[in-house]
């Protein structure tokens, strides 16, 4: 998990998590692809070779929880607030019949003050026709690029999505997490709908 704890090597040591990932053999030995250059978050480790130094955190990317699921729960997404059992978790390309690989995002930039685990949770509650229920889970997309965020999709293409709603882009809280509330209501937010459309479908 990524945070600002100086005793947590996951913040600054790529050997801790990134290089243990099943995706690492496909990364060209490049740690840098896991962090957006616009994310300038840092941490001061309390131990190890960088103890006492200010060093950059290693990651700003997160993977859709609907692609691969939640490791700590045998791949299942069972959060009641996200109607977990109702929605598909894609474990291989052939699972992605709907919405299809070109419409299923896999990785995105996440905000430095909200990123935690390696997954990003798009809350599906209210999709598609109950917009008064739409909300963010703890995970928020990045907005570093002039209120836009980078997404990569299952077919290999990438998109920069320009956000339309101010609620998607609150000011960054430097050096810490803002608003520890797990769910943040954002009714009728078109940006949430855009992510829901490209996340999963009902079983």
Regions found by a protein language model. Name each.
Residues 1-203:
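Short, well-structured segments within or immediately adjacent to enzyme catalytic domains
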């Amino acid at each position: 998990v990524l945070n600002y704890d100086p005793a947590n090597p996951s913040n600054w040591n790529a050997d801790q998590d990134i290089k243990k990932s099943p995706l690492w053999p496909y990364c060209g030995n490049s740690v840098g692809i896991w962090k957006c250059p616009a994310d300038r978050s840092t941490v001061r480790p309390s131990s190890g070779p960088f103890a006492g130094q200010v060093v950059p955190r290693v990651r700003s990317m997160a993977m859709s929880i609907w692609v691969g699921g939640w490791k700590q729960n045998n791949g299942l997404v069972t959060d009641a607030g996200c109607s977990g059992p109702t929605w598909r978790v894609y474990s291989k390309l052939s699972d992605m019949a709907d919405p299809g690989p070109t419409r299923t995002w896999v990785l995105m930039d996440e905000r430095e003050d909200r990123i935690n685990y390696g997954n990003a949770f798009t809350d599906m509650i209210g999709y598609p026709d109950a917009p008064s229920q739409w909300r963010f889970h703890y995970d928020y997309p990045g907005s570093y690029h002039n209120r836009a965020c980078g997404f990569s999709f299952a077919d290999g293409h990438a998109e920069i999505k320009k956000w339309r709603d101010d609620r998607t882009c609150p000011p960054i809280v430097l050096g810490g997490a803002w608003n520890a509330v797990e769910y943040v209501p954002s009714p009728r937010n078109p940006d949430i709908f855009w992510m829901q459309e490209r996340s999963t479908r009902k079983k």
